[in-house]
């Protein structure tokens, strides 16, 4: 099975036909898709003006979409390496009991669905790397009462619309599933009590 970097080379290879290069970009999303496969594809198509069903898109736009995806992947893998090293030090010091962050990282390791969007048409529109930097900043900070990406304070609760492991607090503005460890207990309680309302795209 081809890895991300091998698929990225296929996307950039001008000797391949455009349908194959597009297919390889879609396959990259099976290795790294911060919003989930469908939502990340929708995001890249919107930002780089690629028709979602266009089998022969402008190659420059394909490469630009890949560049954005690669930058985000670099940001996230650097954070994961830092997190893994910290856990190694903690275990060496005898701190072996997993915390809430450990469970969340286990489910998102590798970056697939790290900012999961249950509705593929509703997601942040900033560059992926910027979204991940905002999330990482929140993961390193004290819990807050707002979305770590767009700072929206209206947090709903998603159940049933996504796979069970993705149920939880959802930003009603940008559509991401908010990692529970970055929210205060009061914000989590409010999200559970509130309704998950229709989402609007965020610019």
Pin down the residues of each PLM region:
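Charged, low-complexity interaction regions
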Residues: 12-20, 35-37, 52-56, 116-123
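Short metal-binding segments enriched for Cys and/or His
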Residues: 175-191
């Amino acid at each position: 099975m081809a890895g991300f970097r091998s698929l990225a080379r296929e996307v950039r290879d001008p000797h391949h036909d455009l349908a194959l290069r597009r297919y390889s970009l879609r396959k990259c999303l099976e290795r790294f898709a911060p919003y989930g496969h469908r939502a990340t594809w929708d995001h890249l198509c919107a930002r780089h003006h690629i028709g979602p069903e266009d089998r022969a898109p402008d190659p420059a736009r394909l490469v630009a979409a890949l560049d954005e995806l690669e930058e985000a992947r670099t940001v996230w893998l650097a954070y994961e390496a830092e997190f893994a090293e910290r856990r190694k030090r903690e275990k060496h010091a005898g701190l072996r009991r997993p915390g809430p962050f450990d469970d969340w990282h286990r489910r998102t390791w590798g970056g697939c669905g790290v900012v999961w969007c249950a509705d593929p048409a509703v997601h942040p529109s900033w560059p992926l790397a910027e979204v991940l930097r905002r999330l990482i900043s929140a993961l390193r900070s004290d819990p807050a009462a707002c979305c770590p990406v767009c700072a929206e304070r209206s947090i709903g609760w998603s159940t049933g619309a996504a796979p069970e492991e993705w149920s939880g607090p959802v930003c009603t503005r940008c559509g991401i599933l908010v990692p529970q460890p970055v929210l205060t207990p009061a914000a989590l309680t409010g999200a559970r009590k509130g309704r998950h309302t229709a989402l609007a795209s965020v610019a």
